[in-house]
Amino acid sequence: QERASVIYQHVCALHDFYGEALGVRFARKHIAWYGEHLDNSKAFVQQFHRLTTPLEQRAAVKAFFAM
């Protein structure tokens, strides 16, 4: 799915560019925006906001989109 790939790559780019601490925070903001445009994403967005590492966030995106 192209949308899933774009979102995953965007999250990875945020982590790579901003580093772990800021990258995780910025990824939360962007996932919240993406969530407004995805079906059945409320629980995913809520869970994503509790994640504290890039690895957890990347795994969550993969799991949500079944990548």
Regions found by a protein language model. Give the residues of each.
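Alpha/beta catalytic cores of nucleotide-metabolism and tRNA/nucleoside-modifying enzymes
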Residues: 1-67
